Amino acid sequence: MSIITDVYAREVLDSRGNPTLEVEVYTESGAFGRGMVPSGASTGEHEAVELRDGDKARYGGLGTQKAVDNVNNVIAEHIIGFDVRDQQGIDRAMIALDGTPNKGKLGANAILGVSIAVARAAADYLEVPLYSYLGGFNTKVLPTPMMNIINGGSHSDAPIAFQEFMIVPAGAPTFKEALRWGAEIFHALKKILKERGLETAVGDEGGFAPRFNGTEDGVETIIKAIEAAGYVPGKDVFIGLDCASSEFYDAERKVYDYTKFEGEGAAVRTAAEQIDYLEELVNKYPIITIEDGMDENDWDGWKALTERLGGKVQLVGDDFFVTNTAYLEKGIAEHAANSILIKVNQIGTLTETFDAIEMAKEAGYTAVVSHRSGETEDSTIADIAVATNAGQIKTGSLSRTDRIAKYNQLLRIEDQLGEVAEYRGLKSFYNLKK
């Protein structure tokens, strides 16, 4: 009765109006699962391949019909007949069927859509919530959210090099309260921006994209919003930055060129100067987490940054690790970073995603479950965050339904768990020594 009888993919749109995949899986019993695949704007060069059609006459070349066809005409016939509860077996079968190290033949988007749909169908078959199916009886930790309320870099037209300025309500007693705090700060920030005559249009991830006078102006304005909402920076609410440094790193000159986003007169920093600058920010502001502070291929820079700041602040590898255990294993061995960002479409299956989270935890690294800038109404990452007791999640600002869908799912999960639910706040940053 739990045998897969049908697999079907279709092309749908993501939050940027670009095509992506939606996959449905059916079983003999009538159990059903649907998965939708996100897409990134600033992507690491080592990520699994997102298969696009390349036909400029259709969606500007971004169509996903090839990936859809790979699901319907290749993958389907290989996994029909599997027990839907055999997640690892199905994921491994798809990896073998693709046969490439980066899923470039079938497309990571095709494989991931099936992987998510299989998990959802299994949960439906067993009549349990997805987080419970994936995590088992010890599922209980609601993640501390990192809310991207200022969008810069490749996520907006704002002239700021850093891609994300986040608030982290780690001092809240529950996830529900953390979400309320974040929403109140978001609205306080909007009021401050209006008073300054700055833009309140939002970027890809729902954060504002104003024309700040550099990084410090952005951070200081957020601190004012935290205080205006009635909270204490560095006690109730902390700051997080996603530098996305690979987006403005000049590999030929080996410098971090802020002029790419901030224009003439902006800083151009060597790796050593980049580390010095990040240290200045950490010493000046209540920053608790920095993502991709160095370029994805600057291993020496990452090691130096970790040696300098690794005990004070969370250093998250996104483009640096691309949710890949091979890169993470190297990072652990070389003491580079102390946290990994988890993006399901960087690696392409739930099995490999869970492997990366497990490896990180065993090494004392934190794992931050994350959305992509091109999202859908699919809320699977909320369930993954709770299922793995990851303790941290990045899923955008307090606007745009594609972001709010994940927050609302976490509210439901917290409500369902009842007294068992734990919100660990600062304790979720167990990689810090201070």
Curated annotation (Swiss-Prot):
Major localisation: cytoplasm
Active site, per annotation: 205, 343
Gene3D superfamilies xref list: Enolase-like C-terminal domain (3.20.20.120), Enolase-like, N-terminal domain (3.30.390.10)
Record's function text: Catalyzes the reversible conversion of 2-phosphoglycerate (2-PG) into phosphoenolpyruvate (PEP). It is essential for the degradation of carbohydrates via glycolysis.
Pathway: Carbohydrate degradation; glycolysis; pyruvate from D-glyceraldehyde 3-phosphate: step 4/5
Name of the protein in question: Enolase
Entries under PROSITE patterns matching the protein: ENOLASE (PS00164)
Cofactor: Mg(2+)
